[in-house]
Every structure is written in structure tokens, then in C-alpha cells.
């Protein structure tokens, strides 16, 4: 059994980026932007309404406060401040999720914050502290072996390892930085093959050609890549054809 997640609600005002309606017909978990890198109250409400209507689990996609940089710029935020900002974002999304009759079911950092918490124990602990501050014991999505998942487990939270079908991996099992050529896999057939490899074999081919073991409970297909909805649909169809069960982890 594997979960399919995608980043949704990444727009604000008259600007839109992701095809939320189409993706919500495919994925089982929606990482909803909470206003710090994208998303505004109207967008958050609409995505929560659609997700609840279709039985898709709602997750808080928390970020550094970086609208101009789409949450992808490296920042140094004091731990107490970051914890408060994470809790704030979860709380904001919770209002709209509960109004739609659904809970916020998990938390996933976005962009630079996600990458930072792979190696930075202080920032990882701050994210976990923010999850705790927001109340409940929400699962946390992160890269296998990351400081974030370790910090979550130490705090009594469930750490959920995920894989990225449309991102390139290093031989060490980390994501190739977006600043490097080839970091995003855009060939649709390749994305489908990689998704199957993750789900069936528990591994993926790294940029140097070696096989990297990746034990994932959730598979991410980014919503902001070209033809994202079509790729996600192809991934789901291929997984189901291979006999892989599809279902939310939370």
C-alpha cells in the first residue's frame, strides 16, 4: 500500500499554479500551501472543500515566510520563531479543513525548509515543536533518514518517509538540488518507471547510475511540473496495474 501526495493550493489572488481540481481526482493526500510560500484564505478554503468532498486527506504544507521566493530560498530563522510560524500555518489551514468537515491529517515542510530539515537538527526540532504547539500528534512527511523524521520520532510523532518520482537522487539518497541541471525529471515515462521502482522494488536509480534503497510510504508527484495532473494519473494507473494498493497513510 502506498500513498500518493501532491502540493496543492499554490496560488494566491488571481495567480494560479497547480491544477488542483484535476490532481484531487488522482492523489490520496493533498499538501495544501498555508500562506507563507503560496496560498491565500480563499485558495486554502477552496482546496479544503474539494479535498473533503473527494475523500482526500488534507495536510499542512508549511514553509519559511517567503512568498517572493516561493519558499525555495534558504533562510536562517530562530527556532522559537520557526516553531511559532509552523503552528500558525497549521492553525490557519485547520480552520478551513474543519469547516469542510475534515481534519488536518499531517504536516509536510515545503521547499527550502524541507531540504534544511534533512540535515539541520535545530530546524528539524523547531518544525516538530511547531507541530506539537499546534495541538495533536500529527504525522510528519519527510525524506527517509532525515533529521526531521528522527526528531518527529523522538517527540512521539509518526514520521512518514516519502519518495519523489519526479526528482533526481544522489547516490547518498538525497535530492539533487534544484539549482543543478537534471534535478527535476520531466520525461513522463521516466517518472512512471521511477514510481514503480519506488513502490515495487523500494529503490531508484541515482544520477550516477547506482541503485539507491528508498523505503517510502508515500509518493510525491509535484503539482507545479508540466502536465502534472496527467503524469499523476499515469503513475496511479501504472501502480494499480502492477497490483500496488493506493491509499492514504493518515
Curated annotation (Swiss-Prot):
<comment type="subunit">
    <text>Forms a complex composed of PxpA, PxpB and PxpC.</text>
</comment>
<protein>
    <recommendedName>
        <fullName>5-oxoprolinase subunit A</fullName>
        <ecNumber>3.5.2.9</ecNumber>
    </recommendedName>
</protein>
<comment type="similarity">
    <text>Belongs to the LamB/PxpA family.</text>
</comment>
<keyword id="KW-0547">Nucleotide-binding</keyword>
<dbReference type="Pfam" id="PF03746">
    <property type="entry name" value="LamB_YcsF"/>
</dbReference>
<keyword id="KW-0067">ATP-binding</keyword>
<dbReference type="GO" id="GO:0005975">
    <property type="term" value="P:carbohydrate metabolic process"/>
</dbReference>
<dbReference type="GO" id="GO:0017168">
    <property type="term" value="F:5-oxoprolinase (ATP-hydrolyzing) activity"/>
</dbReference>
<comment type="function">
    <text>Catalyzes the cleavage of 5-oxoproline to form L-glutamate coupled to the hydrolysis of ATP to ADP and inorganic phosphate.</text>
</comment>
<dbReference type="InterPro" id="IPR005501">
    <property type="entry name" value="LamB/YcsF/PxpA-like"/>
</dbReference>
<dbReference type="GO" id="GO:0005524">
    <property type="term" value="F:ATP binding"/>
</dbReference>
<keyword id="KW-0378">Hydrolase</keyword>
<dbReference type="InterPro" id="IPR011330">
    <property type="entry name" value="Glyco_hydro/deAcase_b/a-brl"/>
</dbReference>
Amino acid at each position: 500500500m502506498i500513498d500518493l501526495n501532491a502540493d496543492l493550493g499554490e496560488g494566491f489572488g488571481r495567480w494560479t499554479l497547480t491544477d488542483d481540481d484535476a490532481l484531487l481526482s488522482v492523489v490520496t493526500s493533498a499538501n495544501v500551501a498555508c500562506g507563507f510560500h503560496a496560498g491565500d484564505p480563499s485558495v486554502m478554503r477552496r482546496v479544503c472543500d474539494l479535498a473533503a468532498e473527494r475523500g482526500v486527506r488534507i495536510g499542512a504544507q508549511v514553509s519559511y515566510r517567503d512568498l517572493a521566493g516561493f519558499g525555495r530560498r534558504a533562510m536562517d530563522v530562530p527556532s522559537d520563531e520557526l516553531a511559532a510560524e509552523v503552528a500558525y500555518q497549521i492553525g490557519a489551514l485547520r480552520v478551513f479543513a474543519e469547516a469542510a468537515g475534515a481534519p488536518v491529517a499531517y504536516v509536510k515542510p515545503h521547499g527550502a525548509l524541507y531540504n534544511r530539515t534533512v540535515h539541520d537538527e535545530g530546524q528539524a526540532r523547531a518544525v516538530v515543536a511547531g507541530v506539537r504547539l499546534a495541538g495533536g500528534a500529527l504525522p510528519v512527511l519527510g525524506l527517509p533518514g532525515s533529521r526531521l523524521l528522527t526528531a518527529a520520532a523522538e517527540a512521539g510523532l509518526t514520521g512518514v518517509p516519502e519518495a519523489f518520482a519526479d526528482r533526481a537522487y544522489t547516490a547518498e539518497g538525497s535530492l539533487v538540488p534544484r539549482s543543478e541541471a537534471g534535478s527535476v525529471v520531466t520525461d513522463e515515462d521516466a517518472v512512471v518507471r521511477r514510481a514503480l521502482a519506488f513502490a515495487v522494488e523500494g529503490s531508484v536509480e541515482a544520477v550516477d547510475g547506482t541503485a539507491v534503497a528508498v523505503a517510502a510510504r508515500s509518493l510525491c508527484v509535484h503539482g507545479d511540473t508540466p502536465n502534472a495532473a496527467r503524469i499523476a494519473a499515469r503513475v496511479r494507473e501504472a501502480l494499480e496495474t502492477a497490483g500496488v494498493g493506493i491509499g492514504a497513510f493518515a
